[in-house]
């Protein structure tokens, strides 16, 4: 017999109380909190330089340097993020709470490194920039995943109060 009330499936909290305490106590949370907006700022500047090059053909060297810098910042935040996950969740990557974000992060890293490979392989400038734009598109999706998780963590914290 059908029920008139919906039964809500139990949802796993993003952090257990122990994980939340480790998250709040580790310096790696601060490191991530600094690197994430820095990476976004580097992304915005680099995106503008890449689009400028694609539209005008001017500024290849500056656009290239900005993409290499963006790639370096991405790799830095990935390494420090893995350390953060180890401290908070007990494993370097693919903790259940951030599994899909980590999976997609590898796609983002792969595209950024494909750009670096294309750069050193001497591929045509336009091709390099298209790869960078693909990497940046993937980065935006991945950043949105993390912003969503941050929002969920804040809502979870508010519910606990």
Regions from the PLM with identified roles:
Residues 93-95:
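Interfacial helix-loop-helix linkers and transmembrane-helix boundary segments
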């Amino acid at each position: 017999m059908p029920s008139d009330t919906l039964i809500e499936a139990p949802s796993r909290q993003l952090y257990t109380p122990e994980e939340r305490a480790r998250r709040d106590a580790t310096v790696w949370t601060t490191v991530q909190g600094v690197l994430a907006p820095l990476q976004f700022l580097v992304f915005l500047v680099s995106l503008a330089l890449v689009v400028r090059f694609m539209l005008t053909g001017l500024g290849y060297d500056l656009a290239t340097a900005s993409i290499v810098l963006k790639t370096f910042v991405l790799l830095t935040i990935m390494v420090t993020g893995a350390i953060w996950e180890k401290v908070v969740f007990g494993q370097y990557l693919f903790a259940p709470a951030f599994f899909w974000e980590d999976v997609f992060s590898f796609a983002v890293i792969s595209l950024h490194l494909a750009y670096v490979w294309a750069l050193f392989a001497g591929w045509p400038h336009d091709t390099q920039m298209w790869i960078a734009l693909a990497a940046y598109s993937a980065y935006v999706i991945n950043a949105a995943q993390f912003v969503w998780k941050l929002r969920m963590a804040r809502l979870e914290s508010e519910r606990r109060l």
